[in-house]
């Protein structure tokens, strides 16, 4: 479990399906994150079983109420070092969404900062990236608030929609993160 001042991030559980559905059926959330809104409780149960059950996928819960307010995840990979092709970088990618009733309270940056620290401190990554649909201005804002640098826009295949889409990429290196901690 990862904790912040107001949140705890814990692995998803099948018993979270009802709360997931209530948030994920919102027409404003899924499309901004690149996935279809959940149409039924069964959709949420399937997403829990097939997607959110993966390691490093977390239910974001309000510390006071224990209610699910969103989702965050980490994916780890090795990539070629753009400065030295003989080396590999170990990076983490953060994904997140927060339910609309909880927007505007700084909860996404709070959770993303905790995941960033976890990736650097516990997994020793060289950098953390946030990749978001270019039209999702709120996600770009979260990245900026967390100290990430916007690297640009790429066109990539969105596996959820089956279409090519524009994605913004923001990066925070370990060195920049360490400087910001002082």
Give the ranges of each region predicted by the language model:
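Short linear motifs in intrinsically disordered
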Residues: 14-15, 48-50
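Short loop/turn motifs at secondary-structure junctions and domain boundaries
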Residues: 49-54, 148
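Conserved GNAT-fold acetyl-CoA-binding loop/helix
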Residues: 28-49
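Acyl-donor (CoA/ACP) binding surface of acyl/acetyltransferases
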Residues: 1-28, 57, 61-182
């Amino acid at each position: 479990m990862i904790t912040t001042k107001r949140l705890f991030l814990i692995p998803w559980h099948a018993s979270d399906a009802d709360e997931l559905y209530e948030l994920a059926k919102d027409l404003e959330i899924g499309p901004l994150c690149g996935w279809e809104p959940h149409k039924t409780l069964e959709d949420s149960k399937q997403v829990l079983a097939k997607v959110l059950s993966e390691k490093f996928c977390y239910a974001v819960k309000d510390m006071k109420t224990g209610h699910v307010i969103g989702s965050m995840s980490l994916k780890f990979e090795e990539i070629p070092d753009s400065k030295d092709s003989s080396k590999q970088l170990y990076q983490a990618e953060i994904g997140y969404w927060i339910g609309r009733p909880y927007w505007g309270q700084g909860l996404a940056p709070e959770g993303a900062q905790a995941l960033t620290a976890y990736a650097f401190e516990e997994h020793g990554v060289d950098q953390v990236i946030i990749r978001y649909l270019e039209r999702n201005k709120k996600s770009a804002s979260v990245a900026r608030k967390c100290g990430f640098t916007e690297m640009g826009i790429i066109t990539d295949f969105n596996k959820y929609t089956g279409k090519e889409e524009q994605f913004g990429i923001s990066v925070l290196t370990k060195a920049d993160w360490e400087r910001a901690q002082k």
